[in-house]
């Protein structure tokens, strides 16, 4: 099995983003280049607390070290191509990468703080039939630094109003567990007290259900919140909505969930999108309650976002409430996700898909 370091280095460009480096990696690089390892903490402070935009601004570093940093690294490879702001304060960013690909990042405002939804891949290979992110397939994985830079860019926007990012959800474009090592590096960087210092319990990662990686993630014993994109109460419906279910079947997925809960002691959130006439009836709620019986979990009901390229219709409000009521009657912990950014292209992949359409006209 290839080492984590080798896998990560293979992803890096000729002059990588310094945001890709965990603090211990940066210490090693400094030692190898004749510098004191303690400088890593100073560099992290400039990157994540002061959020400077050039190495020259790192004024407590020697000119020689600043030159070395400039020769070996770039600060960020993201350029803001589009920025949309919703009436409810939701902000959606379309970032252009160094190779011309684009990715999405969303800032969501809540009563409890500001949450950033980050992307982990350019496109997605999973092929969920309700998701705009899969249109065009998977182009490439993001480096950890490209994921970190999304949060930094959003934080820089919030700096203008003296606000801060308080939580992160890894639920943007792509399957995080398909880019596992870079995702782990991202988690360690944003969670580090010298990094963005986002508490582990304020970070959520979601997967469509890549079972081997769920076991691996459980063994990491992180205090990160964990979510599963479930979207169905049985194998037949899940296979229709999510082709990944044909490779990683629902019964095996539930075994992996059980392992995760026992290994970490933490509950799992199940994301359940409601699609009119497909999975939103009371009998589906009854079946879902039976599937989740005895499992330490929370269900997040998601009214589907309309995607023009897909053919699903929205579940009526009264049906959503009936579904919720049925789950509650069986003792299932459940909430309905509050919609945000409804007046902009806020659904995952919509803004990128729109831009791609305009580019090909």
Swiss-Prot record:
Q: Which InterPro entries match?
A: Aldolase_TIM, Methyltransferase_A, RlmN_N, RNA_MTrfase_RlmN, rRNA_lsu_MTrfase_RlmN/Cfr, rSAM
Q: One MF term from GO for this chain?
A: tRNA binding
* Binding sites annotated in the UniProt record for S-adenosyl-L-methionine: 174-175, 206, 229-231, 305
Q: Which reaction does it catalyse?
A: adenosine(2503) in 23S rRNA + 2 reduced [2Fe-2S]-[ferredoxin] + 2 S-adenosyl-L-methionine = 2-methyladenosine(2503) in 23S rRNA + 5'-deoxyadenosine + L-methionine + 2 oxidized [2Fe-2S]-[ferredoxin] + S-adenosyl-L-homocysteine; adenosine(37) in tRNA + 2 reduced [2Fe-2S]-[ferredoxin] + 2 S-adenosyl-L-methionine = 2-methyladenosine(37) in tRNA + 5'-deoxyadenosine + L-methionine + 2 oxidized [2Fe-2S]-[ferredoxin] + S-adenosyl-L-homocysteine
- One Pfam family from the UniProt entry? Radical_SAM
Keyword annotations for this protein?
Answer: 4Fe-4S, Cytoplasm, Disulfide bond, Iron, Iron-sulfur, Metal-binding, Methyltransferase, rRNA processing, S-adenosyl-L-methionine, Transferase, tRNA processing
Q: What class of enzyme is it?
A: transferase
Disulfide-bonded cysteines? 117-348
Q: Which residues form the active site?
A: 104, 348
- PANTHER family hit by this protein: 23S RRNA METHYLTRANSFERASE (PTHR30544), RADICAL SAM CORE DOMAIN-CONTAINING PROTEIN (PTHR30544:SF5)
Put simply, this protein is called: Probable dual-specificity RNA methyltransferase RlmN
Q: Which organism is it from?
A: Bacillus licheniformis (strain ATCC 14580 / DSM 13 / JCM 2505 / CCUG 7422 / NBRC 12200 / NCIMB 9375 / NCTC 10341 / NRRL NRS-1264 / Gibson 46)
């Amino acid at each position: 099995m290839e080492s984590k370091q080798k896998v990560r280095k293979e992803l890096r460009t000729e002059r990588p983003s310094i945001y890709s480096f965990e603090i211990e990696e940066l210490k090693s690089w400094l030692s190898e280049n004749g510098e004191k390892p303690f400088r890593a903490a100073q560099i992290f402070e400039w990157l994540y607390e002061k959020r400077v935009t050039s190495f020259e601004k790192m004024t407590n570093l020697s000119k020689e070290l600043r030159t070395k940093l400039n020769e070996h690294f770039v600060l960020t490879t993201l350029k803001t191509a589009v920025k949309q702001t919703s009436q409810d304060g939701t902000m959606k960013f379309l970032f252009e990468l160094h190779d011309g690909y684009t990715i999405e990042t969303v800032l969501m405002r809540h009563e409890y703080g500001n949450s950033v939804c980050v992307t982990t891949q350019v496109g997605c290979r999973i092929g969920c039939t309700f998701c705009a992110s899969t249109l065009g397939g998977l182009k490439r994985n993001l480096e950890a630094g490209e994921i970190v830079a999304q949060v930094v860019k959003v934080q820089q926007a919030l700096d203008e109003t003296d606000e801060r990012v308080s939580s992160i959800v890894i639920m943007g474009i792509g399957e995080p567990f398909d880019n596992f090592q870079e995702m782990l590096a991202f988690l360690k960087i944003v969670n580090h007290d010298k990094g963005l210092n986002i508490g582990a319990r304020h970070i959520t990662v979601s997967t469509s259900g890549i079972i081997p990686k769920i076991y691996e993630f459980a063994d990491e014993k992180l205090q990160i919140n964990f979510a599963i994109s479930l979207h169905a109460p049985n194998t037949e419906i899940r296979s229709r909505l999510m082709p990944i279910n044909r490779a990683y079947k629902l019964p095996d997925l539930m075994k992996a969930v059980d392992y995760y809960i026992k290994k970490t002691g933490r509950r799992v959130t199940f994301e359940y999108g409601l699609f009119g006439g497909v999975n939103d009836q009371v009998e589906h709620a009854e079946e879902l309650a039976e599937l989740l019986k005895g499992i330490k979990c929370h269900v997040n009901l998601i009214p589907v976002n309309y995607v023009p390229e897909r053919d699903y219709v929205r579940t009526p409000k009264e049906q959503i409430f009936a579904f919720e009521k049925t789950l509650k009657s069986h003792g299932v912990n459940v909430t309905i996700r509050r919609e945000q950014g409804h007046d902009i292209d806020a659904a995952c992949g919509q803004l990128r898909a729109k831009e791609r359409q305009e580019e090909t006209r």
